[in-house]
């Protein structure tokens, strides 16, 4: 069997070593006589899996002791509702909109604000700029009394990334960040955030799991209408197991965390991600056949959208790429073109193979 280079934005490629270990343990996890999917979530075998996964994640991200790690269901999209339910507390929240996902989060919070007895403000948007850059400081309208400031630090569809949170003024308002498509791609200063959430299916593991890292002082403020299962405090008190969690997804996430540690930790992972993204961006910038329209200081290392000079060549490009073992390169339907998602599991050789194919395709069709 020959594996392809999978550039899917999510569910995305997983490290081959992780898949191999999961395959070896599918029928018998470490002598238990059954696989992880068959285990009771309250049995000692699975509780040890969860404990190790959390310990490894804490080590990778240097998570302080006053933060709780939650392994929840519903994906990042459920967090668009769960966050205001838990944090709005009858007050006001600020939202920054820099792409499709932060726009969706803002829309859901607006939808719920009235029922929660609060308000949601648009504190800055780059929609008129086509979501091709980050917000500038002078474009921000931040409320220092806001309950929280929500942002998406990597916009998967538009390929815009905030690598340095220091670009935002520190008003003392808790930062709430959707990091679904770049968490674990570089070291983080967790203490700068009140809450971080990330759908697993890009850089953590399979779909169906969302990881929430929340500062303890933000627990216990849920609206009275919040369903029990969506109350962060309740889930924290129950070790993410008020109900049956997505057990196999947590297991795979734990294997990914161990794999990241084996790569040398997040500093080494970041260096590899910079090398991969630089390789592709340098090629795009030198080409008059392909174009990336994101401002250079706003470009994502994980999701790189690009356009061909002639849209009529899109289908031949994708067909040729598939034949060359390069899959899932079609851009999101809302923006068109192509998109290469090069998460942690994508090796440098995969990006080199893509660049080689793109160079050959442009030579034949330019």
Swiss-Prot record:
Its cofactor is pyridoxal 5'-phosphate. Its main location: cytoplasm. L-glutamate binds at residue 42. Pathway: Amino-acid biosynthesis; L-serine biosynthesis; L-serine from 3-phospho-D-glycerate: step 2/3; Cofactor biosynthesis; pyridoxine 5'-phosphate biosynthesis; pyridoxine 5'-phosphate from D-erythrose 4-phosphate: step 3/5. Its EC number is 2.6.1.52. One of its GO terms (biological process) is pyridoxine biosynthetic process. This is Phosphoserine aminotransferase. The gene is serC.
């Amino acid at each position: 069997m020959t594996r392809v280079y999978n550039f899917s934005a999510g569910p995305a490629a997983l490290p081959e070593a992780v898949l191999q270990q999961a395959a070896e343990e599918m029928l018998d996890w470490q002598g238990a006589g059954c696989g992880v999917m068959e285990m009771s979530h309250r049995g000692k075998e699975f509780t040890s899996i969860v404990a190790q996964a959390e310990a490894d994640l804490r080590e990778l991200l240097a998570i302080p002791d006053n933060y709780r790690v939650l392994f929840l269901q519903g994906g990042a999209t459920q967090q668009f509702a769960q966050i205001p339910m838990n944090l709005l507390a009858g007050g006001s929240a600020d939202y920054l909109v820099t792409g499709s996902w932060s726009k969706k989060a803002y829309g859901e919070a607006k939808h719920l604000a009235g029922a929660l007895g609060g308000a949601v403000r648009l504190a800055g948007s780059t929609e008129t700029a086509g979501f091709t850059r980050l917000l500038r400081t002078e474009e921000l309208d931040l409320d220092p009394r806001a309950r929280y400031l929500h942002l998406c630090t990597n916009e998967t569809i538009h390929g815009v990334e905030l690598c340095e949170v220091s670009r935002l003024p520190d008003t003392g308002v808790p930062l709430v960040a959707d990091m679904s498509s770049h968490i674990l791609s570089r070291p983080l200063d967790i203490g700068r955030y009140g809450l971080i959430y990330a759908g697993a299916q890009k850089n953590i593991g399979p779909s169906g799991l969302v990881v929430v890292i929340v500062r303890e002082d933000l627990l216990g403020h849920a609206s009275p209408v919040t369903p029990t299962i969506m109350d962060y405090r309740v889930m924290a008190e129950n070790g993410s197991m008020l109900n049956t969690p997505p057990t196999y997804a947590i297991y795979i996430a734990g294997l990914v965390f161990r794999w990241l540690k084996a790569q040398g930790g997040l500093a080494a992972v970041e260096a590899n991600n910079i090398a991969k993204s630089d390789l592709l961006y340098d090629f795009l910038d030198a080409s008059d056949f392909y174009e990336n329209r994101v401002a250079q200081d706003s470009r994502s290392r994980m999701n790189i959208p690009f356009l061909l000079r002639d849209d009529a060549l899109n289908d031949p490009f994708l067909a040729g790429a598939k034949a060359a073992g390069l899959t899932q390169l079609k851009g999101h339907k809302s923006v068109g073109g192509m998109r290469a998602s090069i998460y942690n599991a994508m090796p440098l050789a995969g990006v080199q193979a893509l660049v080689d194919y793109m160079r050959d395709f442009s030579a034949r069709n330019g």
